[in-house]
């Protein structure tokens, strides 16, 4: 039989019944993404992924156009059925197949391999047959939109998308006018790409204004596409193997066998394709997409900072005084324009966060059987507290082209880029009590005027009625030895006699200029015994020095614990020097020339100088070594044993540096009695206001010399220690005096009390 005649018969069997339907018009606007759930399993396979529309959408999506809107109308449709496949009895009436297809089936044999099926059948003819479908023509307008660009151009992406939808809906009414306006928007914004297509079906009489003449498979709710596996036309013994081969081709790209066990399916990779389970191309696309989403997240924050609402908010902030986080928050909440812009940012970042999470879940799901481990971190949302801190940094840490981060607790900037030029002058704090009433016009960091009851002194506000010269009659806080820190360091290096304080060395465990074993705790004290010898003075420590000699090749490094009693008392009434903490200095170790001796120096300076009566020094080595203890605990040790003597050290000199302040105990005791008397008489503060102010000033100046403490903890109360040990007051008298001063400070002066911790 002639082959052309056989082909005509087969065509008549396949395209059975034809019916003509009127044309229709459908708009379709959807947010479509390249990868849907399980879409990677069939990526780059089948006719759909090689179609013109899909490839166009993939390319647009990679360019940033994540939203597709399509309005189209179909016309001249025919419903077709494959009547040959509908036959139930394929044995008596076999399907008329092409000779080439029949020859390919015969070449398979009875037990073909998966690769034979793929190369011979699947790659040539596919995996499915068309059972029924709809043919026709289509006229469509497709818009690809980048919502992020629309948001930046118009300020509201939702309204812009709706306006474009309304404009596109008039395409079939006024095609030329609609296309002209859309092209103007495309050129001016770059946020949309417009494509129009007109495809006609085979058999139409008129092909005018058509881009192509070909059959179009239409698919809608009314016109569904029905497919069936190609195995139905194979012999019985080949059907199961064909299904396995088709699944291996679709799911594993022909690089392995598709197997299912325990409700889990995977690809059993061939030796030449060990990574067949890993869709590396899709993973790279998702990683690139996540990187772009992270950039878009950062750009959203920059867009808010560059917006007109944020800039106008920054301009309206007052610059004549310091703004705390709380005051900035108040201005932030009162700016309605900024609030509406901030809500848009929150909604945009929330939508972006959900997209990132969905993409990240897909990415990690694809990487389950990959050697490639994805590294992705979800961008952190900037909280309102971080926004306020950002505003503060823009106000005070944005100078000379540099920028940094502002720390409100320290009122300073941490500049980025290893520079200190980003900090602007920090304005003064305006408030009540000892805060400024107005900042200085000449130097905004200093006070220009003070509140009632305070006077301006060196840019600070101090209580107006305090006579500092009168308090000097009680304790001479200001002396000729108030040197600068550099001067003090120079005088300590020279061992200046003016800073030499005569103390008494006391120790039952150590003798000066005698070697001892430091691996056991040793204690020594330096005391003044002012209550017996120098009752008219209190003493200030500004530094310490020790000369320690070690045996040759010694590996020990001694460690010191120093406790200070400010005004005598027991050991429990002392405080420990926090070396290296809270800005407190450390010991400086300098080796002496041509000797095994070292000078250990501690310079407190003006910042950390404090009162002292007795200094307790505990010495211990930094390493634990085998027990070699001097049983006597005193006297010279045996240095003849080389295994022992390398651990011994000796202290040849211990010295405290400082100066003494004149202290009028009788005059101060009489002032304290007046304070105590006013408290017991029912708070008659007005009659003794000068004494109250004087005692408040003395208490403040004494407690100001207290040692540093951890942030959030109260300072030590040195004033009460002075009342107890130098004025010999009882605990009840000390409580009454402090309570009277606190009442006067809060009720009369309207100042807040500073919390202190009990030491004595």
UniProtKB/Swiss-Prot annotation:
Residues 1-16 form the signal peptide. Its main location: cytoplasm. One of its GO terms (biological process) is homeostasis of number of cells within a tissue. GO terms for cellular component: cytoplasm; glutamatergic synapse; synapse. Keywords: Cell cycle, Cytoplasm, Glycoprotein, Growth arrest, Neurogenesis, Signal. Plays a role in neurogenesis, brain development, and the functioning of GABAergic neurons. May suppress cell cycle progression in postmitotic neurons by inhibiting G1/S transition. Belongs to the BRINP family. This is BMP/retinoic acid-inducible neural-specific protein 1.
């Amino acid at each position: 039989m002639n082959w052309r005649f056989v082909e005509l018969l087969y065509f008549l069997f396949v395209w059975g019944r034809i019916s003509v339907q009127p044309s229709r018009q459908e708009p379709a606007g959807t947010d479509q993404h390249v990868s849907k759930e399980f879409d990677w399993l069939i990526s780059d396979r089948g006719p759909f992924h090689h179609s013109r529309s899909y490839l166009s959408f993939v390319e647009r999506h990679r360019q940033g156009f994540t939203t597709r809107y399509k309005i189209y109308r179909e016309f001249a449709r025919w419903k077709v059925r494959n009547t040959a496949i509908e036959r139930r009895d394929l044995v008596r009436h076999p399907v008329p197949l092409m000779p080439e297809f029949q020859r390919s089936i015969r070449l398979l044999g009875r037990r073909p391999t998966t690769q034979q099926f793929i190369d011979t059948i699947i790659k040539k003819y596919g995996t499915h047959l068309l059972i029924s479908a709809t043919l026709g023509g289509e006229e469509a307008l497709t818009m690809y939109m980048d919502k992020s660009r629309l948001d930046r151009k118009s300020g509201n992406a939702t309204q812009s998308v709706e306006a474009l939808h309304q404009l596109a809906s008039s395409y079939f009414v006024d095609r030329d006018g609609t296309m002209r306006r859309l092209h103007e928007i495309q050129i001016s914004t770059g946020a949309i790409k417009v494509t129009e297509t007109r495809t006609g079906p085979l058999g139409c009489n008129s092909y005018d204004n058509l881009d192509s003449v070909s059959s179009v498979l239409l698919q809608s709710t009314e016109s569904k596409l029905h497919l069936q596996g190609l195995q139905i036309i194979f012999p019985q013994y080949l059907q199961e193997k064909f299904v396995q081969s088709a699944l291996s081709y679709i799911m594993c790209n022909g690089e392995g066998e598709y197997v299912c066990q325990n409700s889990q399916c995977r690809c059993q990779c061939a030796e030449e394709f060990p990574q067949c389970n890993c869709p590396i191309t899709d993973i790279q696309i998702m990683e690139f997409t996540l990187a772009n989403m992270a950039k878009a997240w950062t750009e959203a924050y920059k867009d808010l900072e560059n917006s007109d609402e944020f800039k106008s908010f920054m301009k309206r902030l007052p610059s004549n005084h310091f703004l705390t986080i709380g005051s900035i928050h108040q201005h932030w909440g009162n700016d309605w324009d900024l609030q509406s812009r901030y809500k848009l940012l929150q909604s945009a970042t929330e939508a972006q966060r959900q997209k990132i999470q969905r993409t990240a879940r897909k990415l990690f799901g694809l990487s389950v059987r990959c050697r490639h481990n994805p590294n992705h971190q979800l961008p952190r949302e900037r909280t309102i507290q971080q926004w306020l801190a950002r505003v503060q940094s823009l106000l005070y840490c944005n100078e000379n082209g540099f920028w940094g981060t502002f720390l409100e607790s320290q009122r300073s900037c941490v500049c980025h880029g290893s520079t200190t030029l980003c900090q602007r002058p920090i304005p003064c704090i305006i408030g009540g009590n000892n805060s400024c009433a107005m900042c200085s016009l000449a130097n905004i960091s200093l006070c220009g005027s003070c509140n009632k009851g305070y006077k301006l002194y060196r840019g600070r506000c101090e209580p107006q009625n305090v006579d500092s010269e009168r308090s000097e009659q009680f304790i001479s806080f200001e002396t000729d030895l108030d040197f600068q820190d550099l001067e003090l360091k120079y005088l300590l290096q020279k061992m200046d006699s003016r800073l030499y304080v005569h103390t008494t060395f006391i120790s039952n465990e150590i003798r000066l200029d005698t070697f001892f074993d430091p691996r056991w705790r040793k204690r020594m004290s330096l005391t003044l015994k002012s209550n017996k010898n120098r009752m008219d003075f209190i003493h200030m420590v500004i530094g310490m020095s020790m000369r320690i000699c070690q045996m040759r090749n010694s590996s020990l490094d001694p460690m010191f614990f120093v406790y200070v009693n400010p005004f005598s008392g027991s050991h429990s009434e002392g405080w420990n020097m926090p070396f290296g903490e809270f800005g407190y200095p450390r010991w400086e170790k300098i080796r002496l020339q041509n000797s095994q001796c070292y000078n250990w120096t501690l310079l407190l300076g003006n910042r950390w100088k404090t009162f002292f009566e007795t200094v307790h020094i505990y010495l211990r080595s930094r390493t634990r070594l085998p027990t070699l203890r001097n049983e006597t605990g005193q006297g010279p040790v045996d240095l003849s044993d080389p295994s022992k003597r390398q651990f011994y050290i000796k202290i040849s000199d211990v010295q405290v540096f400082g100066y003494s302040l004149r202290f009028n105990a009788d005059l101060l005791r009489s002032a304290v009695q007046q304070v105590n008397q006013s408290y017991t008489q029912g708070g008659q503060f007005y009659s003794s206001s000068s004494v109250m102010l004087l005692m408040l000033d003395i208490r403040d100046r004494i407690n100001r010399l207290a040692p540093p403490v951890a942030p959030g903890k109260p300072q030590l109360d040195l004033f009460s220690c002075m009342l107890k040990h130098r004025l010999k007051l009882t605990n009840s008298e000390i409580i009454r005096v402090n309570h009277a001063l606190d009442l006067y400070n809060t009720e009369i002066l309207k100042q807040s009390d500073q919390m202190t911790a009990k030491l004595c």
